[in-house]
Design a protein with these regions (language model features):
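N-terminal secretory targeting modules
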Residues: 1-147
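Catalytic nucleophile-elbow at a beta strand-turn-alpha helix junction centered on a G-D-S/GDSL motif
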Residues: 145-165
Length: 167
């Protein structure tokens, strides 16, 4: 997903994994910010395809199971199709770290997809597979491309949401 036509928003790739801000900058703020900068909350990958399936191949370098939040929040990905919720993918419950693959059936029509990264997990790599012969295109552009920076607490973030796309 690090190459066109995929578009990454909310995170960037640095030192072998996705981060919300450079780790050196996070260290300068405080330990809390540094500790959370590798969590991929808010990370999204956008693209368009007419594939009849999507293969999500995720390599997680951290999973943060919590007693007060669902497992999918730290290890799963939400998929939106044409700006509407489509599917949630997550590894099996006995998964700890590493790679997992999920194949999601689709209808073979051209759609714009957004894959939302885990809120509290860490993502080393994310691959999206499509069917042979399927078109893979850039996503539909945002209506307003100006960036928005919003600061708040874990409540603002959606810290205990039921799935990643709700953060």
């Amino acid at each position: 997903v690090r190459n066109a036509p995929f578009e990454i928003n909310g995170v960037f790739f640095s030192d072998g994994h996705f981060v919300r801000m450079p780790e050196e900058d996070a260290k300068k703020v405080n330990e809390g910010v540094y500790g959370l900068c590798s969590c991929t909350a808010g990370g999204r990958v956008r693209f368009s395809t007419d594939s009849d399936f999507l293969a999500v191949i995720a390599d997680l370098n951290s999973v943060c199971p919590m007693s007060h939040a669902p497992y999918v929040l730290s290890a799963g990905f939400d998929i939106y199709r044409d700006n509407e919720y489509f599917k949630t993918v997550q590894p099996p419950l006995d998964f700890s770290l590493g790679v997992y693959t999920t194949v999601v059936p689709a209808d073979g029509k051209m759609h714009s997809y957004t894959v939302v990264m885990p809120c509290y997990g860490g993502v080393r790599s994310l691959l999206i597979g499509v069917g042979e012969g399927a078109q893979l295109k850039s996503p539909v552009p945002f209506r307003d491309s100006a960036p928005v920076i919003y600061y708040g607490s874990s409540i603002t973030q959606g810290g205990c949401a039921s799935r990643p796309g709700l953060t």
